[in-house]
């Protein structure tokens, strides 16, 4: 779904994007967008806490978000995007999650 170069994997990268990035909120997601200025592919990170649901629900939400982000590519280089799922994302249809991700990426990455 989302290739390795497009994933945030280090905790320090997550922290930097959340603390220094622009934040966009909605009823199902909070999205932090940071333009690092580096020449590398756009990277996505996901935070899905236990408040969202049990492990099955959290993994389903994470897979849906990864698919929604993969559909946004290609994006400008050097952008880190961290998506925090809120409890309402557990019951939201994929189309609503996709629309939320599109809206946040459009506002932050363009």
PLM regions and their residue ranges:
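Positively charged, solvent-exposed patches that mediate nucleic-acid binding
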Residues: 1-110
């Amino acid at each position: 779904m989302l290739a390795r170069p497009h994933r945030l994997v280090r905790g320090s990268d997550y922290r930097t994007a959340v603390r220094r990035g622009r934040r966009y909120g909605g009823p199902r997601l909070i999205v932090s967008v940071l333009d690092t200025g580096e020449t590398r592919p756009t990277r996505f990170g996901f935070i899905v806490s236990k408040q969202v649901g049990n492990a099955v629900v959290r993994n389903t939400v994470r897979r849906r978000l990864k698919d929604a982000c993969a559909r946004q590519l290609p994006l400008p280089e050097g952008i880190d995007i961290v998506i925090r799922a809120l409890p309402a994302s557990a019951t939201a249809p994929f189309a609503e999650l996709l629309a939320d991700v599109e809206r946040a990426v459009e506002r932050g990455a363009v």
